[in-house]
From Swiss-Prot:
Gene name in the database record: rplM
Record keyword Ribosomal protein present: yes
Identification of the protein by name: Large ribosomal subunit protein uL13
InterPro entries per UniProt: Ribosomal_uL13, Ribosomal_uL13_bac-type, Ribosomal_uL13_sf
Species this chain originates from: Verminephrobacter eiseniae (strain EF01-2)
GO biological process, one term: translation
One cellular component (GO) term of this entry: cytosolic large ribosomal subunit
Length: 147
């Protein structure tokens, strides 16, 4: 018996929706990264995109534990001398709900063409509405609510 290697044309990408209300950022991000890669499937093949589409709603209501809402800092640089900007988690959530979750998931995916294709299958929305109802996404429950 030989090992099965998935072929891109044979892979079925399902759609899932996750409600991030009162869930912990890292726990949601790690589960989403696992499902975007397709490692939860028996046909997982490292060089083929076997993952599913993930829609995350209520990303504005995701939590972090402890004092990370003030201590966790996201940096970006404009390219000019002295052009570094630092924003903490609370301010980033207020200005761009869901971007912290996108950055966390992106950091857990492989870097390169396959990883870039995987991150495109992640759809994050700050509110409870999403435009993907035509795909009939299944509800995916994730453990790890903030205490």
């Amino acid at each position: 018996m030989s090992t099965i290697s998935a072929k891109p044309a044979e892979v079925v990408h399902e759609w899932f929706v996750i409600d991030a209300t009162d869930k912990v950022l890292g726990r949601v991000a790690s589960e989403v990264a696992l499902r975007l890669r397709g490692k939860h499937k028996a046909i997982y093949t490292p060089h083929v995109d076997t993952g599913d589409f993930i829609v995350i709603i209520n990303a504005a209501r995701i939590k972090v534990t402890g004092t990370k809402s003030l201590d966790k800092v996201y940096y970006r640089h404009s390219g000019y001398p002295g052009g570094i900007t630092a924003v903490n988690f609370r301010d980033m959530q207020a200005r761009h709900p869901g971007r912290a979750l996108e950055k966390a998931v992106k950091g857990m995916l492989p870097k390169g063409p396959l990883g870039y294709a995987m991150i495109k299958k992640l759809k994050v929305y700050g509110g409870p509405e999403h435009p993907h109802s035509a795909q009939q996404p299944k509800v995916l429950e994730i453990q790890g609510a903030a205490r």
